[in-house]
Amino acid sequence: MDRCCVDVAAAVQLAAVAGGARRVILMGHSFGGAVAVRVGVGLSETVAGIATFATQSAGCEIAGALGGKPLLLFHGDLDEILPLQASEVVRAIAGSGEVVVCEGDGHLLAKSAEMMMAKLDEWIPATLFE
């Protein structure tokens, strides 16, 4: 996981910050959700918020260090790979955040795409420009 975090942090620094962005939102699915949380802790000045999709909780033990940073966790209630409780654990460790239950959806969250996009369309600007 550490190498993945280094890769994402480098991408944020090179692509986003060098391109003029002051703040970014990180997103990750499954294992990538844990990577996004860890990088969000490490780059706290640059990362405005984190959105995860069916994240695992392993690797998110440091989520408490997010310090109230906006955290949005989508998770299907029928996920057979990582149970909904994984996102609930991450939110509990972080001490804040919102778990959005994607009812009737599994790990890939395919049935919830429109709902998630609508939520992100509101959440991203509110998070970046708060």
PLM segments and residue spans:
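Short alpha-helix in the alpha/beta-hydrolase fold that links the catalytic acid
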Residues: P83-R91
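Gly/Ala-rich beta-loop-alpha elbow adjacent to hydrolase catalytic centers
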Residues: G28-G32, A36
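Short beta-strand/loop motif that positions the catalytic acidic residue
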Residues: L66-G67, L73-H75, D79
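Catalytic histidine neighborhood in serine/cysteine hydrolases
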Residues: A92-L108
